[in-house]
């Protein structure tokens, strides 16, 4: 792997294309996104029209669809699939275009819920749209660095690490 074109790798993921072929993806701090299928690297950066050169996190779709999400600085969350990429539209409920981390969970009715950690709090995006959660909601810090879902006998919990400490969400409440 000494042929990797950047020294600033930030995250890795594997996706499966429509033909079933696996692709290895690497996000970088300053050079965009790279894909490896077989030998050699294919770049997705400013020259290729990718919306950000700073990739902070990657998440393959858990349902096996040939797409994944890239969390970026400046473009927020970007959906990447065989047809190309698209950014989530600006929304007044989101205070930042920096996606440091994210997590996909299921809501009480089985619906998809996205949690996006930003430098200005945590976005919870469900069927109703996005809602920003900050220290006013119980998070110990605004800059969210990582997210984890933990299944417990009492139900699922979301854990968040922030610059300021960690917090656990049970139901609709954060505990720091």
Regions found by a protein language model. Name each.
Residues 1-176:
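Carboxylate-rich, polar loop motifs that coordinate divalent cations or form catalytic acidic clusters
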């Amino acid at each position: 792997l000494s042929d990797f074109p950047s020294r600033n790798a930030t995250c890795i993921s594997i996706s499966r294309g429509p033909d079933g072929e696996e692709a290895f993806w690497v996000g970088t701090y300053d050079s965009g996104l790279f894909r490896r299928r077989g030998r050699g690297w294919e770049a997705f950066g400013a020259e290729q029209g990718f919306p950000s050169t700073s990739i902070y996190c990657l998440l393959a779709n858990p349902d096996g669809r040939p797409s994944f999400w890239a969390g970026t600085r400046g473009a927020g969350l970007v959906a990447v699939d065989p047809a190309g990429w698209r950014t989530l539209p600006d929304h007044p409920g989101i205070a930042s275009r920096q996606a440091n981390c994210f997590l996909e969970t299921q809501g009480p009715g089985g619906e998809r819920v996205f949690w996006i950690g930003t430098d200005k709090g945590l976005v919870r995006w469900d069927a109703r749209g996005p809602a920003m959660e900050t220290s006013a909601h119980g998070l110990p810090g605004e800059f969210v660095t990582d997210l984890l879902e933990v299944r417990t006998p009492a139900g699922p919990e979301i854990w968040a690490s922030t610059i300021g400490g960690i917090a656990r969400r049970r139901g609709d409440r954060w505990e720091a």
